[in-house]
Curated annotation (Swiss-Prot):
This is Basic phospholipase A2 BmjeTX-I. Snake venom phospholipase A2 (PLA2) that induces a slight blockade of neuromuscular contraction in an indirectly stimulated chick biventer cervicis nerve-muscle preparation. Does not inhibit contraction of chick biventer cervicic nerve-muscle preparation in response to treatment with acetylcholine or KCl. The neuromuscular blockade is mediated by inhibitory action at the presynaptic motor nerve endings. Lyses skeletal myoblasts and myotubes in vitro, and intramuscular injection causes local muscle necrosis. Induces edema in the mouse foot pad. Induces a transient increase of IL-6 levels. It comes from Bothrops marajoensis. It holds the Pfam family Phospholip_A2_1. The active site is at H48, D89. GO terms for molecular function: calcium ion binding; calcium-dependent phospholipase A2 activity; phospholipase A2 activity; phospholipid binding; toxin activity. Keywords: Calcium, Disulfide bond, Hydrolase, Lipid degradation, Lipid metabolism, Metal-binding, Myotoxin, Neurotoxin, Presynaptic neurotoxin, Secreted, Toxin. Binds 1 Ca(2+) ion. Its EC number is 3.1.1.4. Signal peptide: none annotated. Its cofactor is Ca(2+). The keyword Calcium applies. Expressed by the venom gland.
Length: 121
């Protein structure tokens, strides 16, 4: 669910998720707007959208899953029916951390150059 997802992002990046990533670039935020991803951070969101699109179990983004932290690493519950969803959220949280250096405030609320998707997943 969004709360769990936000907690992963906060712990991985130290950033409060909504103001930082809620409307960033062409893909960060509810349902990407399309176009070419804006640098690494926005690419994380593009990949996350694709990951959600490929879910075969627990396709609702508001479903809860089990996860824990082990030595600073997110571990998704092995037998959880929503493990795929957890793995998608884990990947983007880690991607955000790895791409903190690509974050550019000029891409917040940046809609002008975002068009229909031109990159298939």
């Amino acid at each position: 669910d969004l709360w769990q997802f936000g907690q992963m992002i906060l712990k991985e990046t130290g950033k409060i998720p909504f103001p930082y990533y809620g409307a960033y670039g062409c893909y960060c935020g509810w349902g990407g707007r399309g176009g070419k991803p804006k640098a690494g951070t926005d690419r994380c969101c593009y990949v996350h959208d694709c990951c959600y699109g490929k879910l075969t179990s627990c396709p609702k983004t508001d479903d809860r899953y089990s996860y824990s932290w082990l030595d600073g690493t997110i571990v998704c519950g092995e037998d959880d029916p929503c493990k795929e969803l957890c793995e998608c959220d884990k990947k983007i949280a880690v991607c955000f951390r790895e791409n903190l250096g690509t974050y550019n405030k000029k891409y917040r609320y940046h809609l002008k150059s975002c068009k229909k998707a031109d990159k298939p997943c």
